A protein has these predicted regions:
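Conserved ABC ATPase signature
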Residues: 64-69, 73
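Hydrophobic anchor residue at the start of the ABC signature
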Residues: 79, 107
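A short, proline-enriched helix->beta-strand linker immediately N-terminal to the Walker B motif
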Residues: 84-88
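Catalytic Walker B motif of ABC-type/P-loop ATPase nucleotide-binding domains
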Residues: 90-93
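Conserved catalytic segment of ABC-fold P-loop ATPases
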Residues: 132-139
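C-terminal boundary and immediately downstream tail of ABC-type ATPase nucleotide-binding domains
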Residues: 140, 152-174
Length: 174
């Protein structure tokens, strides 16, 4: 499925190669699926994708090794690596957990915009606030589907496990 389905890993600290600079890793990710791309187009695509995710100090970021960057910054770069090939399906495994609350909301809005542009996102999360931004919700317990529906699940849960989850957290109702 190559560039059609991309994955945002949960832990960017273990996902990046510690011996390669961030810029090189992003370029390799893009070039793997677009071998005909010119060097100039490649650099522009990498820069634009990082800027789209709110990363501005591009020269420093691109020349850095993963261990020189914060967890939140690496998470945004991990998301950029997944988005750089413009997939039709994006699997996001706890993609916003390493990011502070303010940036998490901004990033969730960006992911929502991507969905309106035709990309589907499978968002795996334990954060019910993040899940409340989805169009469809699947509640799972021990790998088993418990309940499925729209965000209406948060207002009218049918299953006991869903009720238990909702009682364990404070969630602003839509």
């Amino acid at each position: 499925y190559g560039k059609e389905i991309c994955y945002i890993m949960q832990n960017p600290m273990t996902a990046f190669n510690p011996s390669l600079r961030i810029g090189r890793q992003l370029e390799k990710t893009c070039y793997l699926h677009n071998p005909q791309i010119s060097r100039q187009e490649l650099q522009l695509l990498v820069s634009n994708t990082l800027q789209q995710l709110g990363l501005d100090d591009l020269k420093r970021i691109l020349k850095s090794y993963p261990d020189a960057l914060s967890g939140g910054m690496l998470q945004r770069i991990m998301i950029a690596a997944a988005l750089i090939n413009q997939p039709t399906i994006l699997v996001a495994d706890e993609a916003t957990t390493a990011i502070d609350a303010c940036n998490r909301i901004e990033l969730m809005q960006l992911l929502r915009q991507l969905c309106s542009g035709g990309m589907a996102i499978l968002f795996v999360t334990h954060d019910l606030r993040a899940a409340s931004m989805a169009d469809r919700i699947l509640i799972m317990n021990n790998g088993q589907l418990v309940e499925a529906g729209t965000t209406q699940i948060f207002n009218e849960p049918k299953e006991e496990y869903t009720k238990y989850l909702l009682s364990a957290c404070t969630l602003e109702r839509r």
